[in-house]
Structure formats: C-alpha cells, structure tokens
Amino acid sequence: MKDTPKRSNEPVVWLLFGAGTTVSAMFYPVLVLILGFLLPFGLIDPKNIIELIGFLHSPLGKLLLLVLLIFPMWGAMHRIHHGMHDFKIHIPASGVIFYGLSVLYTVLVCFAVFSL
C-alpha cells in the first residue's frame, strides 16, 4: 500500500463550481430584474445605465464583470460533466473537454474585458 496520497484537481474544480453557483444564485436574479423588466418598461432612468457602463470600465467594474461571467461558466460545465456521468453518458476525457472549454472561455472573457 502506498503512503503518498494521490494528487487530484477536484478541490480546485469544486471551488470554481461553488463560486459559480453562488454568483449565479446571488446576482443573476437581480440582473434579470434590472435588464429584463425595469429597463425595458422605463422604470430605470437611462442616465443610471450610462453611469453603470462607466463603472464597468473601471478596474473594480472589470473585476466584477469577470466574476459575473467566468464563475457561472465553471459551475455550469461542472454540472454538465457530472450530469452526463449520472445519465450514464460516458465521453472519453470528458473532464478535459468540459474543463478545457471553461479555461478557453475564461481566457476569451479576460481578453474581451481587458480590451474594453
């Protein structure tokens, strides 16, 4: 029997999954309310939206935008990966595929946000 434990990437993936589901649960209902109801029905002054866009160009705003875009994708890909396993759909190297897509998405979003 080996005394050294096997290394795993699961703690990192579960951290990103947990962050993604938390961000989705806390912020997305507010975004749907604002962008889906209040803004289209004219209940929000358009001047406030211009100020919000200005905030998103600041370093703190860019960080918030990264959090709102990246972490939910990690959560979704983790759910899809394990959901396919639960439905007995086994894809060779599915972890590499799904988490690799999340890494690619992360790089693309970082590039897009920091080029604003």
From Swiss-Prot:
The chain crosses the membrane at residues 24-44, 52-72, 96-116. One of its GO terms (biological process) is fumarate metabolic process. It comes from the Bacteria. Keywords: Cell inner membrane, Cell membrane, Membrane, Transmembrane, Transmembrane helix. GO terms for molecular function: succinate dehydrogenase activity. One of its GO terms (cellular component) is plasma membrane. Part of an enzyme complex containing four subunits: a flavoprotein (FrdA), an iron-sulfur protein (FrdB), and two hydrophobic anchor proteins (FrdC and FrdD). Belongs to the FrdD family. NCBIfam families: PRK05470.1-1 (NF003977). This is Fumarate reductase subunit D.
